């Protein structure tokens, strides 16, 4: 079910060990360290294979994440804001990744621009608690969603390329 490129990307992301969410104070700090280490490794691997496609940062508590993601299509870079909150029941519950500016532009999205991950990603996440983290959500959730939805939205004329600096 997972293509070779995704399998290769996934194999380069460290698995997490600490089963802790935002309510777990000291354990959450340890989990956040693991999350950052996995994200850093994933970004390094992406850059090394010329597949760099997102930047993320979080608030001090590690409960709100935000940044940019982009998708290259026909030699044009389409860039989107990305955001999500860490659920209180994390890591049992996966984060709901949102691309607010695409809200309402595709059927594979919930209110607020949250991308639909129920059919393929959520069962996989559930089988891999607590080993999967934010980097895995990006690799197995957002990346495939962008690969399917962005070209479709472009072909339908729902989104169009904008030069940097133009509005």
From Swiss-Prot:
Coiled coil: none annotated. Belongs to the ubiquitin-conjugating enzyme family. UFC1 subfamily. It comes from Anopheles gambiae. GO terms for molecular function: UFM1 conjugating enzyme activity; UFM1 transferase activity. The lineage of its organism: Eukaryota, Metazoa, Ecdysozoa, Arthropoda, Hexapoda. It holds the Pfam family UFC1. InterPro entries: UBQ-conjugating_enzyme/RWD (IPR016135), Ufc1 (IPR014806). Keywords: Ubl conjugation pathway. This is Ubiquitin-fold modifier-conjugating enzyme 1. Gene3D superfamilies: Ubiquitin Conjugating Enzyme (3.10.110.10). The active site is at residue 116. E2-like enzyme which forms an intermediate with UFM1 via a thioester linkage. GO terms for biological process: protein ufmylation; response to endoplasmic reticulum stress; reticulophagy.
């Amino acid at each position: 079910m997972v293509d070779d490129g995704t399998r290769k990307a996934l194999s380069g992301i460290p698995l997490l060990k600490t089963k802790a969410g935002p309510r777990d104070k000291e354990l959450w700090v340890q989990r956040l360290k693991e999350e950052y280490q996995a994200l850093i490794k994933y970004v390094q691997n992406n850059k090394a294979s010329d597949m760099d496609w997102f930047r993320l940062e979080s608030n001090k508590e590690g409960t709100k994440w935000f940044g940019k993601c982009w998708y290259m299509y026909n030699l044009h870079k389409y860039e989107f804001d990305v955001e999500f909150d860490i659920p209180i029941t994390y890591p049992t519950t996966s984060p709901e990744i949102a691309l607010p500016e695409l809200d309402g532009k595709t059927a594979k999205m919930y209110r607020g621009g949250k991308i639909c991950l129920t059919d393929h990603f959520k069962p996989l996440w559930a089988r891999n608690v607590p080993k999967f983290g934010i980097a895995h959500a990006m690799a197995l959730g957002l990346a495939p969603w962008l690969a399917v939805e962005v070209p479709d939205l472009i072909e339908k004329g729902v989104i169009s390329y904008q030069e940097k600096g133009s509005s």
